[in-house]
Amino acid sequence: NISSIEVEAVLLRHPSVQEVAVVGLPHEKWGEAPHAFVVLRPGATLAEEELRAFARERLAGFKVPKGMTVLPELPKTATGKIQKYVLRGGRTAIAAQ
C-alpha cells in the first residue's frame, strides 16, 4: 500500500509544483500504480522525467508515480477539497480540458 499523502508531500517540495494529487490508476503489471496530477506554479515548466527523478531521490521506487498529468487546476468541492474520485475516473477527459 502506498500513502498518497506521503507521495504528495514529497512532490510538493519541488519548486515548480504548486498543487498535487496522487491517485492509484490501473496498471497492467501491478494492478494499480500511483499517478500524479500536478498544477504548476505560474511560469513554471516541468518534464515528467524531472519530477520522477526528484521523487526517486526521496521515495522508495515503488512509491514513485508512474505517470504525471499537468492540469491548470485540480477538481475541488465547494469547500476546497480535492475530488480524487474525479481524477481517478476521468483522467482522459480532464487532461483534454
Predicted regions and their residues:
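Acidic/polar alpha-helix N-cap and adjacent early helical turns
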Residues: 89-97
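AMP-binding/adenylate-forming catalytic core of the ANL superfamily
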Residues: 1-63, 69-75, 80-89
